[in-house]
UniProtKB/Swiss-Prot annotation:
This is Cytochrome c oxidase subunit 4 isoform 1, mitochondrial. The modification N6-acetyllysine is found at K29, K53, K60, K67. Component of the cytochrome c oxidase, the last enzyme in the mitochondrial electron transport chain which drives oxidative phosphorylation. The respiratory chain contains 3 multisubunit complexes succinate dehydrogenase (complex II, CII), ubiquinol-cytochrome c oxidoreductase (cytochrome b-c1 complex, complex III, CIII) and cytochrome c oxidase (complex IV, CIV), that cooperate to transfer electrons derived from NADH and succinate to molecular oxygen, creating an electrochemical gradient over the inner membrane that drives transmembrane transport and the ATP synthase. Pathway: Energy metabolism; oxidative phosphorylation. Signal peptide: none annotated. Belongs to the cytochrome c oxidase IV family. Its main location: mitochondrion.
Length: 97
């Protein structure tokens, strides 16, 4: 009877200690919902932020060309500028899966 109590106590401590050790290193990172986020939704057509946040050198050059006349831009450059702001077009969003 005494041995059963001792093993019971040791077993409980071992379990609770191992649970504490496992839970100690895990940090849960919560998302800050105060900051605007990008969403692709038909009912929310203009998101608060652009799809691409960190621009490459070629993307920055295209953004500089955007400040000039749009008639001087090719169709591919216009599509590239669109893709910087949006991930999907309305046609792509409306496409059935």
């Amino acid at each position: 009877m005494l041995a059963t109590r001792v093993f019971n106590l040791i077993g409980r401590r071992a379990i609770s200690t191992s649970v504490c050790v496992r839970a100690h290193g895990s940090x849960v990172k919560s998302e800050d919902y105060a900051l605007p986020v990008y969403v692709d939704r038909r009912d929310y057509p203009l998101p608060d932020v652009a799809h691409v946040k960190n621009l490459s050198a070629s993307q920055k050059a295209x953004k500089e060309k955007e400040k000039a006349s749009w008639s001087s831009l090719s169709m591919d450059e216009k599509v590239e500028l669109y893709r910087l702001k949006f991930n999907e077009s309305f046609a792509e969003m409306n496409r059935s899966t």
